[in-house]
Amino acid sequence: MAYEFSLPNKTIMGENALEASGETLKSFGEKAFIVSGKVVTKMGTVKILTDYLTELDIKFEIFNDITGEPTDTMIEAGVKAYKDAGCDFCIAIGGGSPLDSGKAIAAMTELEGNICDYMGTSIEGKFPKLVLIPTTAGTGSEATKFSIITDTKNNVKILLKGEALLPDLAIIDYKFSMTSPKSVTAATGMDALTHAVEAYASKKANPLTDTYALSAIKRVFKYLPIAYKDGENKKAREEMALAAYEAGVCINNSSVTLVHGMSRPIGALFHVAHGISNAMLIKECLSYVIDGSYEKFANIARVINEDNDNLSDKEASEEFINELDKICNICEIPTLKEYGINKDEFYKLMDKMAEDAMNSGSPSNTIKNISKQDLINIYEKLWK
């Protein structure tokens, strides 16, 4: 069976990747619209970018009003600021939220209506050139055709997609992630792991995504614990930056499954960081679907630890679940209760969350057929 495989138009990766991108940046126009958040700006990361743009004689306008959960109203404000400033192209720098926002803003400078109008459709068009610079290692947004924005009217996260949302240039330099605090390192690292595992166990998986996925999984299990414990470890940061990109490439081509489908409603309704809500769910979700393909989950276990080579597929799959539990403990992933979520409120909204998850389409991509009741059962298990 034939399959498609898409990547960002151009990727510059490694130490001093920003400085290696000068000619490409100059070719995009005379004035850049920088999309970021206040934390990244305060940490001085945006200044590194603006100093380099100044060296290149590229003017810029900074829009740093993006928060951890970007909304449709933020996108509207960004589009207005872009047009008012007369910019030529867009650079988004930060974690997944600024990067997702940069995609949406660039698209909406040319599209009509509200960003929420495009949920469930394939976004197409010729938009301003888009540059994505991740400062965390995990979301993989720099390699995907997806953007997640909160619809404030309906209080739901919407998934936007389309080849036109892929960046024209992705700049990946581990140095930008060196200042990430432990909590962000854990959340984004677990997000990368979730991407890779879901892509590998997806109905849309293909030989190329399988290769990227297993490589990313191996890197995360080896280097995330190191990066979490020692944020100044350059080797761990560099390997996690690569793992995040690999995992992003995976979901760009074979998509996510029930973990992400169930995670988005938790983030939208209880304001849990995306990577953390994924990590809260991943063990229970995969335990629920593991019998959909013992062979695939066994392959993951054997990539993580060669000692699993002598186990049966079923035994190796179960060992993979144990390894998930271990890495979640190492990264101190909280439970819903520890995060401060009210159980009664959660149960009251459980049916809506399951409905929203099913409507996202992600659960239907799972290697095992999943129903709304299955999702409710998994949500309940998070409290046991």
PLM segments and residue spans:
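ATP/NTP phosphate-donor binding region
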Residues: M1-F89, L336
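Carboxylate- and glycine-rich phosphate/diphosphate-binding segment that chelates Mg2+/Mn2+
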Residues: F146-S254, T366, Q373
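C-terminal charged capping/lid subdomain of soluble metabolic enzymes
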Residues: D307-K384
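Active-site segments that bind and position negatively charged phosphate/pyrophosphate groups
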Residues: A199-K326
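Short glycine/serine/threonine-rich phosphate/pyrophosphate-binding segments
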Residues: L18-S21, K42-T45, D72, S97-K103, ...
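Fold-independent oxyanion-binding glycine-rich loops
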Residues: N9, E15-N16, S36-K38, I66, ...
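Glycine/threonine-rich beta-strand-loop-alpha-helix active-site module
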Residues: T73-K175
